[in-house]
């Protein structure tokens, strides 16, 4: 038990002070021995840290006695050496303030020293791993020491000597081993990877490694070799990475003429993707490089880096600003121009081997062509995506939207230009896959357009290509100077591009389905209904569309709508109603057609998991007018439901048609509940009043209401369609009249019906025969086909019908009141 807790204990400050004097004497011995060990350590950096260990205050491990035992030594009575250092009269020495633990003084290492120790530890493991031919471990050691070196550069520590020694050791290990000696595939793969990385690192640190080879002993004695930029000669650059000075793109831009071209380009490449990177300075510096580029290779390399940097600058924006977008487009034009001029010497392809050193031109292949790794069409796709995003964010009612839409032609020109380039330079085994991407983009810009608009785009595109440096050789359809882009040419373009995608069914089902839908949409819009229907039915798209991605589902829904409109234009009312019915009854028609606003799509983005919001929206100029869809659907319902309702109410047994929100039957039932009916104002009102006129047998008034609907002008050849629709209204009004008023006639004159509905006698006879056969009406034509003779049956009058309905309602309400 401690003496402090004893009742008889008396604190003696004198004895305590004597004990502390003994302790402090032993501590001074430990401190002095520890300081001698510290002085013997080597330093491997330019900036040597002053030891701060003398300022460390460690509590004594010996137990203090007295009521102030819990205080720090300097606050106790008598202090750590028998006196309080805060008293003015006290002669306090700072050496007495440090105290050690029983096992000796604890040495605190700086971050530099810890990083150095880790590098030394890895350096010591290289020999043992090499002796065992463990290249997987060697590769891990190389990756670890590279991470440490990167950390040293980030902290502005310079280049450690131990890193240079490690590089030289790795190089010796690689040189001493032959790949033929390695039988294991995994080890051989690790060896090849290590060899390539070491080769690159030695190249980057050539000056430092060379100095080490010449005088290894100096690296053990001298603290540091200066760090260089990408391990090249620092004297060639106006700045250095060594010490505490960082890379500055502004400095590069201001001293561009003093720098080596590829050194500067490497600095720009290394700065991409890093935090706090100034994209404006990157673009400015790269543009300066483009101005001083002399060889085609330098221009190509600069373009391949400048265009992605422009896209990087707008990655956090809704879309790329117009100025930068046009600059990117001009850069792409410039890149293609250089490649077209030097097509026999330089080619940019996605399938070229990787070049670790950009300053070294790739070796020429067997055809004498130097292949440069890059993806031209990826940049074209990105440019197209930024164009689409800008259209989605611009107000569709503004003049800015129309101005922006004019840039679509330049995108289309680039796509065709890329197609011609890829046809010439891409190897046969990769051509189909790459051209499929090109054709997808090309079709996206023309499949929904009318023949007139496609002709304009094709004519302008091929005219610009003929004026440029591009080759006009193509194995696909192209527009010659003597040809005209008429409807036949447009159909040939769409068919050839779509068929190319359709043929890839075994390799790429996605391309097959998109090609089928592109072709179906175009034919339904510009040609005929029957061929489009045949293409759609012959494919299996409808079976699997529910499991497809959002973009394909939207395209499929658009095709279905266009098929319905094509059937309406062909006068196939029943088929049009069947095709449109599945989509028009959907309350989210705007969303499933991709015609919602971008803001609304962002709010509902959780509906389609994993789909980019831009895929759920189409630019405004690609929309199918929803009012037109509703008008066509309700007009079809008008022509089908009104005669059907008249037949049902007249007592004829007919199959009951399902009632939907937009069906004319539901609209009529809703209108009957209204107390006051004003003149028609909306689209729905005009259809309603046309239906009521048909029920009365007034076909002229019904046609007049339909003609007042303005959306008919959106259909091609709208006058012909209205005339065709008028004839349909006449016939269906005749049917409605016969069903409604047959109970009042024993026979009706055919000639009278012909005059009443302004139809030929042959058509009236055909309608009468159709009613008798299809609806099983108890009637017949006389021998001379002059009258329709009705047989009296168990038909009820209108008054009886109302009475029966009233009885049913009374019975229903009586039972309800009893409950």
Curated annotation (Swiss-Prot):
Q: Where is the composition biased (Acidic residues)?
A: 17-41, 47-59
Which superkingdom does the taxonomy of this entry point to?
Eukaryota
Q: Which GO terms describe its molecular function?
A: RNA binding; translation initiation factor activity; translation initiation factor binding
Cellular location(s): Cytoplasm
GO CC list: eukaryotic 43S preinitiation complex; eukaryotic 48S preinitiation complex; eukaryotic translation initiation factor 3 complex; proteasome regulatory particle, lid subcomplex
Task: From the UniProt entry, list the residue stretches annotated as the region Disordered.
Answer: 1-106
> In its UniProt record, which GO terms are filed under biological process?
formation of cytoplasmic translation initiation complex
* Domain PCI, chain residue ranges per copy: 620-795
Keywords of this protein's UniProt record, alphabetized? Cytoplasm, Initiation factor, Protein biosynthesis
HAMAP family hit by this protein: eIF3c (MF_03002)
* The protein's role, per its UniProt record: Component of the eukaryotic translation initiation factor 3 (eIF-3) complex, which is involved in protein synthesis of a specialized repertoire of mRNAs and, together with other initiation factors, stimulates binding of mRNA and methionyl-tRNAi to the 40S ribosome. The eIF-3 complex specifically targets and initiates translation of a subset of mRNAs involved in cell proliferation.
Question: What binding partners and quaternary form does the record give?
Answer: Component of the eukaryotic translation initiation factor 3 (eIF-3) complex.
Q: Which family does it belong to?
A: Belongs to the eIF-3 subunit C family.
Name the record gives this protein = Eukaryotic translation initiation factor 3 subunit C
* Organism annotation: Kluyveromyces lactis (strain ATCC 8585 / CBS 2359 / DSM 70799 / NBRC 1267 / NRRL Y-1140 / WM37) (Yeast)
User: Lineage in the entry?
Assistant: Eukaryota, Fungi, Dikarya, Ascomycota, Saccharomycotina
Gene name, please? NIP1
């Amino acid at each position: 038990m401690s003496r402090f807790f004893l009742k008889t204990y008396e604190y003696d400050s004198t004895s305590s002070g004597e004990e502390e004097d003994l302790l402090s004497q032993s501590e001074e011995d430990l401190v002095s021995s520890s300081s001698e060990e510290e002085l013997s350590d080597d330093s491997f950096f330019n900036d040597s840290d002053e030891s701060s260990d003398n300022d460390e205050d460690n509590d004594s491990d010996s137990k203090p006695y007295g009521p102030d035992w819990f205080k720090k030594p300097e606050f106790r009575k008598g202090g750590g050496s028998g006196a309080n250092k805060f008293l003015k009269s006290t002669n306090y020495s700072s050496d007495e303030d440090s105290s050690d633990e029983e096992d000796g003084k604890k040495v605190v290492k700086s971050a530099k020293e810890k990083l150095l120790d880790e590098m030394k530890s890895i350096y010591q493991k290289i020999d043992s791993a090499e002796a065992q031919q463990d290249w997987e471990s060697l590769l891990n050691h190389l990756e670890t020491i590279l991470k440490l070196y990167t950390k040293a550069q980030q902290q502005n520590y310079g280049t450690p000597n131990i890193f240079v020694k490690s590089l030289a050791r790795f190089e010796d290990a690689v040189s001493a081993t032959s790949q033929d000696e390695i039988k294991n595939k995994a080890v051989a793969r690790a060896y090849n990877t290590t060899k390539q990385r070491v080769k690159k690192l030695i190249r980057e640190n050539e000056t430092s490694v060379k100095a080490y080879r010449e005088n290894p002993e100096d690296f053990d004695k001298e603290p540091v070799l200066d760090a260089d930029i990408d391990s090249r000669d620092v004297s060639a650059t106006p700045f250095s990475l060594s010490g505490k000075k960082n890379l500055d793109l502004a400095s590069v831009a201001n001293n561009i003429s003093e720098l080596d071209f590829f050194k500067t380009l490497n600095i720009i490449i290394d700065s991409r993707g890093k935090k706090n990177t100034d994209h404006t300075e990157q673009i400015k510096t790269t543009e300066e490089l483009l101005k001083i580029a002399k060889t085609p290779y330098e221009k190509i390399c600069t373009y391949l880096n400048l265009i992605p940097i422009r896209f990087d600058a707008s990655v956090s924006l809704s879309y790329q600003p117009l100025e930068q977008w046009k600059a990117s487009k001009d850069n792409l034009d410039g890149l293609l121009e250089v490649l077209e001029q030097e097509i026999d010497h330089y080619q940019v392809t996605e399938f070229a081997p990787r070049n670790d050193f950009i300053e070294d031109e790739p070796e020429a292949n067997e055809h004498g062509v130097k292949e440069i790794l890059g993806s031209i069409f990826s940049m074209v796709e990105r440019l197209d995506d930024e164009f689409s995003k800008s259209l989605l964010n611009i107000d569709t009612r503004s003049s800015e939207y129309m101005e922006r839409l004019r840039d679509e032609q330049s995108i289309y020109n680039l796509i065709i230009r890329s197609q011609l380039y890829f046809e010439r330079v891409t190897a046969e085994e990769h051509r189909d896959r790459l051209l499929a991407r090109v054709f997808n983009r090309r079709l996206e810009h023309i499949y929904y357009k009318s023949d007139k608009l496609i002709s304009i785009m094709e004519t302008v595109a091929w005219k610009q290509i003929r004026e440029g440096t591009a080759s006009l050789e193509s194995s696909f359809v192209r527009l010659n100077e003597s040809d005209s882009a008429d409807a036949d040419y447009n159909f040939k373009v769409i068919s050839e591009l779509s068929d190319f995608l359709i043929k890839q069914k075994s390799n790429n089902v996605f391309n097959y389905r998109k090609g089928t839908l592109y072709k179906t949409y175009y034919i339904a819009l510009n040609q005929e209904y029957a061929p489009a229907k045949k293409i759609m039915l012959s494919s299996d798209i409808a079976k699997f569309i529910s499991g497809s991605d959002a973009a394909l589902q939207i395209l499929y829904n658009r095709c279905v709508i266009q098929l319905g409109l094509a059937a309406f234009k062909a006068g196939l009312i029943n088929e049009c109603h069947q095709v449109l019915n599945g989509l028009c009854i959907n309350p989210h028609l705007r969303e499933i057609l991709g015609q919602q606003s971008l803001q609304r799509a962002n709010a509902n983005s959780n509906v389609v998991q994993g789909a980019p919001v831009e895929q759920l929206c189409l630019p405004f100029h690609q929309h199918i007018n929803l009012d037109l869809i509703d008008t066509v659907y309700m007009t079809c319902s008008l022509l089908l439901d009104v005669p059907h309702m008249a037949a049902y109410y007249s007592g004829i047994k007919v199959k009951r048609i399902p009632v939907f929100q937009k069906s004319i039957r539901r609209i009529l039932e809703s209108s009957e509940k209204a107390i006051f009916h004003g003149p028609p104002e909306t689209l729905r009102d005009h259809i309603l009043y046309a239906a009521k006129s048909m029920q009365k047998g007034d076909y002229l008034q019904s046609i007049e209401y339909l003609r007042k609907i303005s959306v008919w002008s959106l259909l091609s050849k709208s006058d012909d369609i209205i005339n065709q629709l008028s004839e349909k209204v006449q016939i269906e009004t005749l049917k409605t009249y016969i069903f409604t008023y047959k109970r009042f006639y024993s026979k009706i004159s055919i000639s009278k019906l012909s005059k009443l509905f302004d139809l030929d006698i042959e058509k009236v006879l055909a309608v009468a025969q159709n009613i008798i056969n299809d609806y099983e009406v108890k009637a017949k034509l006389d021998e001379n086909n002059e009258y329709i003779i009705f047989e009296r049956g168990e038909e009820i009058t209108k008054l009886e019908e109302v009475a029966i309905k009233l009885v049913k309602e009374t019975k229903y309400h009586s039972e309800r009141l009893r409950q």
